[in-house]
């Protein structure tokens, strides 16, 4: 448990860097899932400034994206990842989810790229409603798909307004492309950064309620190699 959001990012980012360096020491390439949202600002800032990572040997994957948003929209995750990650490090490859293209086509392409090997590290957060990526409650824990099209619930859409990505609920897309819970859980390592008082109830439910699709992030308790990084605000109900 860190003091504040900035420290959450310092811890999460340096741990992610340590894992990537270790993986690259033992194998030719590393495969990384990168998350977005306000919770990841400091984590990505720290990770991209860490020394000793041969980024040319890292293949990175996009976790989720709104359907219908172009990369130049301020709330686009493509734009976020381009500005906060891809433009900062010479990553070997980055597999974007393009929200403007035919969703079925995007899902098929992303699934093929993802399926070429195991994922070494996933950087993720937890939503105010307990979602993982855009898998809102009740989440599908059973699907064997890697990516799918999901409908966003109102709590998830309101969170995006609250974080300042959109001016009103009407502006927030109703559907998105998302990596599935099963695909996230298949990662060898997970670093989950969750700062902010807004997430306190979701954190408590994740750690203390039964493991249930109604609290999608509760499934993380079944992962053997996960580090959950909180700040005093997000941990205040524990």
PLM regions with names:
Residues 179-182, 186-238:
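ATP/nucleoside-binding phosphotransfer catalytic cores, i.e., glycine-rich phosphate-binding loops
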Residues 21-51:
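Glycine-rich N-terminal segment of FAD-binding domains in flavoprotein oxidoreductases
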Residues 54-123:
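Ligand-binding beta-strand-loop-alpha-helix segment within the catalytic cores
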Residues 1-32, 104:
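N-terminal glycine-/serine-/threonine-rich phosphate-binding loop
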Residues 133-179:
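Class I SAM-dependent methyltransferase SAM-binding "motif I" and its flanking Rossmann-like core
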């Amino acid at each position: 448990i860190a003091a504040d959001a900035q420290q959450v990012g310092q811890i999460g980012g340096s741990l992610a860097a340590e894992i990537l360096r270790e993986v690259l020491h033992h194998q030719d390439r590393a495969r990384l899932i990168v998350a977005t949202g306000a919770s990841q600002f400091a984590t990505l800032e720290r990770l991209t400034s860490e020394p000793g990572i041969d980024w040319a040997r890292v293949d990175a994957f996009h976790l989720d994206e709104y359907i219908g948003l172009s990369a130049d929209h301020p709330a686009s995750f493509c734009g976020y990842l381009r500005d906060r990650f891809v433009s900062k490090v010479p990553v070997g490859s980055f597999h974007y989810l393009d929200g403007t293209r035919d969703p079925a086509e995007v899902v098929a392409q992303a699934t093929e790229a993802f399926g070429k090997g195991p994922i070494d590290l996933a950087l993720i957060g937890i939503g105010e409603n307990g979602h993982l990526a855009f898998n809102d409650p009740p989440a599908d824990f059973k699907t064997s798909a890697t990516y799918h099209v999901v409908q966003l619930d109102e709590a998830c859409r309101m969170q995006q307004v609250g974080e300042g990505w959109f001016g009103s609920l009407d502006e927030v897309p109703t559907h998105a492309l998302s990596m599935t819970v099963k695909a996230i859980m298949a990662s060898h390592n997970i670093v989950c950064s969750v700062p902010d008082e807004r997430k306190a109830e979701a954190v408590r439910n994740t750690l203390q309620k039964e493991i249930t699709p109604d609290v999608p992030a509760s499934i993380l308790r079944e992962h053997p190699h996960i580090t959950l990084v909180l700040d005093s605000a997000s941990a205040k109900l524990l």
